Amino acid sequence: MFSLDTDDDTTPAATAEPRNSYLEEKAFKSRTLLIFGGITDSVAADVTRRLIALDADSAEKPIDILVSSPGGHLESGDAIHDVVRFISAPVNMIGTGWVGSAATHLFLAAPRERRVCLPNTRFLIHQPSGGAGGQATDIAIQAQEILKARHRIAHEIARETGKPVDVVLADIERDRWLSAQEAVEYGLVSRIIERKTELHR
């Protein structure tokens, strides 16, 4: 996903769209997608559409996804996660900036050997949260769904990192921040890279 600040008065509005289209085209041709900022339904729709298009273009060539996101809507992250696994083309996940919450979940869609990060990336794992309102029965239902999501996320992290589920459940009870090296040790990523040339070794 690309975003240009069109509110900047120093940038003529007429040049914003061509510049955006140029960047979009260059990124697409290089089979590179960006997930930056909050994960929403619109972001999920955009990313999954591009994944399917790139997979149709070539099911053998890898797709690179750079992720720098605080997270967002869990089900939107689920959509990206599942489509990454649904397509045939291999996907490389590249963490940069920070990868947190629902973004960590979609990051884990790639096999461990295809999960890398840049040196200053930080990761955040924690349990899902949500606001509960309405009648008491509705609040109880929402609370139950959050507990289900918590266990689902814990099992996914455990499966993809090799950590015991009970350890992951304890780790996500509160915010758990990890540096790039700590993420490697935890199993979230396979290695830290500094150059693009290191990605496809």
Q: Which residue stretches match the model-derived regions?
A:
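Terminal-region recognition feature
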Residues: 1-201
